[in-house]
Amino acid sequence: LHAPDGRLRLRNVLQHPLFLNNYDVIIVDSQGARSVMLEMIVLSATDSVVGMVNPVLPDVREFIRGTVNVMENLLPYRELGIPLPKVRTLVNCMDYTALARKTLDELAGIIQTGRYSRQLPEGAVSLLSTQIYDLNIYKQGHAAGQPVHRLEKESTRRSDSALVTMHSLACELFPEWKQAFDGLLANGGIRQ
């Protein structure tokens, strides 16, 4: 990883015909903390990366500072013809408090006005409309090793069911597959 081309190796591997011809999308999960691995993943992304943030002011500040810093440090790679992906921000562990709503509004304002960076191009960071609420169903899904959209199809609470939330997120991230996702939603999250 620390070789001169270390940060570009994953990008080069993913451009092999084995990947280009057989996969519509490749999703890579990373720890998120600043690391060479995170930089490799960002440089390998062809369209966008998803950054998750909790609606707590210190977390939001650290997310903006850390994410923007990583992206700004990778700007010189554009001179090598490597475009940087857009950062799509997903709010995770949202709750029903006024403080969380206020924090989310502040984050949205920072992103919409582009106050996160003087170096990154306009629109480099955006905020997804879908929010993942801090609900037990997500913990249950993790503990059971099951996708939450199969565990909770309907809900009586104010926030959407896990199925509707995952459908919204999938449609927002991959609008080209919305019709297929709509079919999955209509079938209660079960593929036909």
Task: Please provide the spans of the model-predicted regions.
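P-loop/Walker-type NTP enzyme "switch/lid" segment
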Residues: 1-21
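Generic alpha-helical secondary structure signal
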Residues: 9, 36-40, 143
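Phosphate/oxyanion-binding active-site loops and adjacent basic polyanion-contact surfaces
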Residues: 2-7, 59-66, 161-166, 170
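Generic structural signal for well-ordered alpha-helical scaffold segments
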Residues: 11-15, 75, 170, 174
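Conserved catalytic-core segment of NTP-binding enzymes
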Residues: 16, 20-122, 126-127
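C-terminal lobe/tail of nucleotide-utilizing enzymes
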Residues: 80-192
